[in-house]
């Protein structure tokens, strides 16, 4: 009889301990449910890169003096610099410059050590292609400036979307003269602050 009571009390203690552990796990889950989402719905929402973001390299052909410092400081000797010596002026003339972004590690050494600042990092990070040879950018492709994330044609239409007014479940129930269905996300955030 005493052994049976001991087993029942042990079972009760273990049940209480299990419930405590489940409660701890659920408290963490509920804590995370109250937080704002960290992720974005890419490509419709894009985070604006930080100021020191190292994206695709921008190259200015006219500033380059073909010194090849960028090749020497690159850990993988990546930039290809073709030049010709002009005997009349006694200077190097740049003929061709290219970088293969399929191999580039975006360390930024070439940008930092360039004496004429003809190289700079941009905020462009969407370089994915179906053919790896398209990642080999020549001086023409490196020279074009990328568009800003805030001016992206995929993101811009989303700014015009609004929420339905409170209590309206179907957008067809709105009055015909109403141009926008509700408040924009920026307006809702401004009201809450």
From Swiss-Prot:
Disulfide bonds: none annotated. It comes from the Bacteria. NDH-1 is composed of at least 11 different subunits. It comes from Rippkaea orientalis (strain PCC 8801 / RF-1) (Cyanothece sp. (strain PCC 8801)). SUPFAM superfamilies: 4Fe-4S ferredoxins. Its EC number is 7.1.1.-. It holds the Pfam family Fer4_7. Binds 2 [4Fe-4S] clusters per subunit. Transmembrane segments: none annotated. Residues 169-193 are annotated as: Disordered. NDH-1 shuttles electrons from an unknown electron donor, via FMN and iron-sulfur (Fe-S) centers, to quinones in the respiratory and/or the photosynthetic chain. The immediate electron acceptor for the enzyme in this species is believed to be plastoquinone. Couples the redox reaction to proton translocation, and thus conserves the redox energy in a proton gradient. It catalyses: a plastoquinone + NADH + (n+1) H(+)(in) = a plastoquinol + NAD(+) + n H(+)(out); a plastoquinone + NADPH + (n+1) H(+)(in) = a plastoquinol + NADP(+) + n H(+)(out). The lineage of its organism: Bacteria, Bacillati, Cyanobacteriota, Cyanophyceae, Oscillatoriophycideae. [4Fe-4S] cluster 2 binds at residues 74, 104, 107, 110. This is NAD(P)H-quinone oxidoreductase subunit I. It is a peripheral membrane protein. Keywords: 4Fe-4S, Iron, Iron-sulfur, Membrane, Metal-binding, NAD, NADP, Plastoquinone, Quinone, Repeat, Thylakoid, Translocase. [4Fe-4S] cluster 1 binds at residues 64, 67, 70, 114. One of its GO terms (molecular function) is NADH dehydrogenase (ubiquinone) activity. Residues 55-84, 95-124 form the 4Fe-4S ferredoxin-type domain. InterPro entries: 4Fe4S_Fe-S-bd, 4Fe4S_Fe_S_CS, NADH_quinone_OxRdtase_chainI, NDHI. Its cofactor is [4Fe-4S] cluster. GO terms for biological process: photosynthesis, light reaction. It is an enzyme of class 7 (translocase). GO terms for cellular component: plasma membrane-derived thylakoid membrane.
């Amino acid at each position: 009889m005493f052994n049976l009571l001991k087993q029942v009390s042990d079972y009760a203690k273990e049940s209480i301990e299990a419930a405590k552990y489940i409660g701890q796990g659920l408290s963490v889950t509920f804590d995370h449910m109250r937080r704002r989402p960290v992720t974005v719905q890419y490509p419709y929402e894009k985070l604006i890169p930080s100021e020191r973001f190292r994206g695709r390299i921008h190259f200015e052909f006219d500033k380059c003096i073909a010194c090849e410092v960028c090749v020497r400081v690159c850990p993988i000797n990546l930039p290809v610099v073709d030049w010709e010596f002009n005997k009349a002026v006694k200077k190097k003339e740049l003929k061709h410059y290219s970088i293969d972004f399929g191999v580039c590690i975006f360390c930024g050494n070439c940008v930092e050590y360039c004496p004429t600042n003809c190289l700079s990092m941009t905020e462009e990070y969407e370089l994915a292609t179906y053919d790896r040879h398209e990642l080999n950018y020549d001086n023409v492709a490196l020279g074009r400036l990328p568009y800003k994330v805030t001016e992206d044609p995929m993101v811009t239409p989303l700014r015009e979307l609004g929420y339905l007014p409170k209590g309206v479940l179907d957008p067809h129930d709105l009055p015909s003269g109403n141009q926008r269905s509700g408040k924009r996300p920026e307006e809702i955030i401004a009201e809450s602050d």
